[in-house]
Amino acid sequence: MTKLTNGHLVTQDSVGVTRHDYLYRISLKALIYNDAGQILVVKEINRTYWDLPGGGMDYDEDFESSLKRELYEEVGYKGDLRYQLFDASEQMYIERLDANQICFYCRVWSENIDFIPGEEGDEIMFINPEELLLQKSEVDAPARAHAAHMKWQELHSEIVR
């Protein structure tokens, strides 16, 4: 017998041994700066908070195709891009998905910064990184976006030294 419970499969074999296999949703977030050092954020439709553009990988996608799809869906971006994976979140349980999630953060360099709200984006803007901490939110997405910025700055300063 197998059932999905709290983000993992619970399986009981024929002799009564129970096994827990955790399911993970892989999510990608794009850290994109403009020339003024501001960060691109999106407020998705039916959400009340600002976050980095990105989302869950679909089956059979690699990082680049997933990033391109998410950037198109949320901020209307269709061009080429370069990216560097630089951090991963701790595992977190997402109740609405009944799944555990690990989020990978990617620094993205785009061909241009002509962004418009995509089909899943309600509003977009560039924001000073410190202002992310002032955003009122029922979730910690703005704080996680700021933490990603700080991590990138830390890594980038080590590379420059």
Describe the residue ranges of each PLM region.
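Acidic, metal-coordinating catalytic segment for phosphate/diphosphate chemistry
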Residues: 1-29
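Nudix hydrolase/Nudix homology domain
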Residues: 48-49, 119-161
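Conserved hydrophobic "DFG−1" position in protein kinase catalytic cores
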Residues: 32-33, 41, 106, 126
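A short coil-to-beta-strand element that immediately follows conserved catalytic motifs
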Residues: 78-87
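Conserved Nudix-box catalytic region and its N-terminal flanking loop in Nudix hydrolases
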Residues: 34-74
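Short helix-loop capping/hinge motifs at secondary-structure junctions, enriched
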Residues: 38-39, 111-115
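Active-site-adjacent beta-strand/loop module that shapes the phosphate/pyrophosphate-binding cleft
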Residues: 90-113, 125
